[in-house]
A protein has these predicted regions:
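Auxiliary, metal-adjacent structural segments of Zn-dependent hydrolase domains
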Residues: 8-63
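Short, surface-exposed loop and linker segments with low hydrophobicity and enrichment for Pro/Ser/Thr
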Residues: 27-29, 64, 79-85
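Post-signal/leader-peptide non-cytosolic segments of secretory proteins
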Residues: 38, 66-69, 84, 97
């Protein structure tokens, strides 16, 4: 896995959904505009100790438009993560963008807001992403998007 190729995480997610059975549509076919990108702290932010308060985010343009995926990732934080943590972060953001999930209150869920814990292992990830695909985690809530005509 190439740590710096964010598109590969999208491709893994799309294939994982297809293989899971019941995970949803073929997001690769459905998504017409894929924008997954790194953000970098500028020199003045670095010197002052100020950095963005998020590691990654999806945006309105993505989660309220079924044809778009728009996810930004803070490179400085990303580069410190192991593979399982990177998968967890990206699946979390795809959960917002593709499934329109809000955050969960259960730390065992991918949709929990702080998902870069060091105690996450491969089995934790598999269980959490399977629950996400099946839409079967407690307190599931969806992002509200405006109706379009």
């Amino acid at each position: 896995t190439d740590r710096d190729n964010l598109e590969q995480y999208w491709n893994k997610f799309v294939e994982d959904v297809k293989c899971s059975g019941g995970g949803g549509a073929d997001w690769g076919e459905r998504t017409k505009f894929l924008n997954v990108f790194f953000e970098y702290a500028d020199i003045s932010q670095t010197i002052s100790g100020i950095t963005p308060s998020h590691l990654a985010y999806s945006s309105f343009v993505g989660y309220c438009n079924d044809e778009r995926v728009n996810i930004g990732v803070l490179y400085d934080g990303w580069s410190d993560l192991n593979l399982i943590q990177r998968l967890w972060v990206m699946y979390h953001e795809f959960g917002h963008d593709v499934y329109k999930y809000e955050h969960s209150t259960d730390p065992a869920d991918i949709m929990y807001p702080s998902s870069t814990r060091s105690d996450i292992d491969l089995n934790d990830f598999i269980r959490a992403k399977d629950r996400m695909f099946r839409r079967s985690f407690p307190g599931i809530r969806y992002i509200s998007c405006p109706q379009t005509d």
